[in-house]
Amino acid sequence: MADKNKHHLAMAIRAINTLAVSAATLALAPSALAQEQKVLEEVVVQGIRYSLEEAADRKRADGRVVDVIVAEDIGKLPDNNIAEALQRITGVTINRDFGVGSEVSIRGLKENRVEVNGRSTMGDGRNGINFEDFPAGFLSAVEVVKSPTPEMVEGALGGTISLKTARPLDLKDTVMAATYDMEYADKADNWAPKINIAAGDSWDFGDAGVFGAMAMFSYQDRTLRQDSYETSLFVYDHTQIANLDQPAQNTPSGDYVVAAEHKFEPYTEERERTAYNVTLQWAPASEKGNFYLDVNATERDGNQEAYSILYASGSPVATADTYEDENGALNNYRMEGVVAIPKTWSSFRSTEAFTNAFGGEWNFTDKLKVSGEFSRAESKTFEPASEFNWRSVDAAAEALNPSAANELKSDLTVVNSNSKPGSVVFDDGDIFAQTENFAFREYRYIDERVNNEETAFKFDVEYAEPFDLEWVTAVKTGIRHTENDYERTQSELRLKDIYKNLKDANGDPAIIWMDEIAAAFPGSIITPGVGSDAFDHTGIAGPNALTNFTVYDAGRLKNVNETFRMVQQLLAGSNYNTPGNSDGYISTNGSVADDLVESKGSYALIGEETSAFYLQANLDFDRWHVIVGGRYVETDITSTAYNQEGTSLVVEKQSYDDLLPSVNVAYDLMDDTIVRFAAAKVMRRADYNELSPTYIFNSDRITATKGNPALEPYRATQYDIAIEHYFGTGNMVSAALFYKDIASFLKETSRCDYVPDAMATQNQSIYENICIKDFDNRFANTSDYTFASSQAEFDTAVAESRNGILTTLPSNGESGKVQGLELGYQQAFDFLPGLWSGFGVNANYTYADSEDPDGVALEDISKNTYNAQLYWEHSGFGMRLAYTYRDEFLDDVYQKRTERVGTQVGYNDGVSDPTAGNSYRDELSQLDFSANWDVNDNIGLVFNVTNLTAEPTVNRSVTGTVWQVQENDRRFTLGLRAKL
């Protein structure tokens, strides 16, 4: 078995080099038996076909329910990262960030474990490293394990994604390989480089043993763009809509759903990633074992810029063209008395992550093997963010009465669309694109840092055929101990409501106009050209004033010190220089760091210790192959946070233990047909933000999320039954049924919380989004709340301290379930003549059904998902079309912009509605293309297109009304591969 594994690893490394997206390469040393088999076959299979054959062989030989991708399969696809390769596997779906794969769900569950060579990876949460941070080129294979065994580390609810890197002692000759790609993103209109380099060798020192070393380097720098059109959905009784005299006909309550706020946001993101991987390995001359040192480090820096203009407030008015659609939403209507809030955003993300390990294994006898490993994984994330926004103000009214609100308002006509950004047209033309109509409203800077680290030790013992029982292949046992520390800090500078609360040195009302800033600071105010090509793939339903706006330059905003000094000058001598000012404080000559205020409500420190022991037996009875045993794990968690007043730290502790039995059975029904059965208990600890009793506020201090340190983990019992039939070379068909009973399901509840510090800095101009409590509960946290229907009603509530923070927090609920079917088929058509023999297909389908305790489908689970890949390879040329589809799914249980809309339509209908705030994502499909040409044995060329059809992402309320449309880049890649 060891020789076979080494042979598989060697072939995988050769695959990486052949396509050279990765940095590993060929020249590996297969076993003597494997070499003999190659000679007998007299066929060298490479490229996509080799990769699929190898994946089928590994799946067939494994005792678990598992799917495998070898590195060449990753390299051959037009896939930018591991996530986009994993989406080709049955039961796996992904989410994308700016069109790039970032999150993986296994059978609809995102609570998975991501490991490298069996050890933990670290990100800014529980799920491990972000797939955008880890180069696919570092890998020899990726396994998706759906049925665990006792020796595997606990913590996966959906499955374990096991990333495998190469070992240098598998190298036969010196390895040197390099790849160079240039990627073009069409919306960003940017060419970006990606470089991979690998070098490795091994040396035989005779009696001193064999030493090997491998080093890999990867660099990528890219710019991406995303266009986003959003609305906020409100619920109106027909009496609140002018010129409308009848209730809605298509909602249970008779209320109408109205998109009352609109904005267009073009985002541009720059991403730079540098990664290193070094492995040193030594084996003594006795060949009884080996020792290794793995060092992996990733640095990723990214800057995001965005502009928008939000049209808010106003009252809906029906016209002769107004109608109600089948979802109860109002269409073709007017909004009267709308105000404008232009915004500029800039955020930066810097992440440093590493995973280091020292370990080895030793065969004391032919039967007894021991192994151990000490590892450390750490991630440090620094994420500052800035915002600069304005408010439309009537200059003439301001001159007459500067103490009044003096908002500049306009009327607009809205024409909605089912899958495109709607049309928004102002009566007053470009009134909200003129600098003289805007006043400085707010400046905000946030400094957020997350440190996450794990120290782990494990020790394993394996004994083959104890008591000479041939049917007991091996008995394994081991221990593992970990110590985890997670810390999150946040500090903030916020200067709000400047347009209405600014006072000069004499205490008189003052205002700072946009055109004044433009004159005093040339180049600071711009009219970005991003609106001219907005949604150029998807199109817009009609004329849209949202794409024409004037804002503060994002290039200046990301220069924190430059913008801070400008704001200091603008507010010099004002009430904002007074410490304790309720709208914010800025010094006259200090630095950003000096003026930052620690957000004690956001501080979190979580310590976690786990201790695990397992016992496993591998059994063989002729046609039966069984892996059975159990894993016992103890967990101790300490959560530290500030009390609600922010005056002292409070420590809360939680302990629990789990016994996790499992069995995997494989039965050779026929020589080429395997029937599998697996059953297991699994657990997944709650994420750190679910455990931390701290508040994470949104930008307006209107909503927040909060953890619960008393949470028990997710616990589930799962069953799998599968049949696999293999035919020819690497061809297979498979079917699997799966069922998961999630016994301690986490559910989210909402309440209106009393958080004085946050309430003092609330953006109260969006009063209709702020929760209101009754008088008796004004200083309490309560689930009994409502919303103001008018500014006057809200002002009264604030005067009585009845406003609060709408807070979402998790709790352990009842059971939920996930069940489904997986079908897979792959075949190379090598029986066809000539060029036709180069064709092959790989396709799969997954059906998943899910339900939470409220009867609502679980997040991120599509009922139907399928992938189809058609490839052709012949005489050094290769091409592949890859299509991925998933149908509608619940994207978010609670989305702020749909929080008022549920199946019962409104909050105030007297019905408890668990679907209120649900957001569903429309069906998604993507078509990718790749082609390659091996010029000779050392040089290769590749061409890829990702997102050929440029499909938009559309999000809807549970009633079917569109609230968001997003569009991403179509990406083209040209690349060169070279090896020695």
Model-derived regions, located:
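N-terminal periplasmic "start-of-domain" segments of outer-membrane beta-barrel proteins
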Residues: 44-75, 102-103, 112, 119-121
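Short acidic/polar hinge/loop motifs at secondary-structure boundaries
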Residues: 119-147
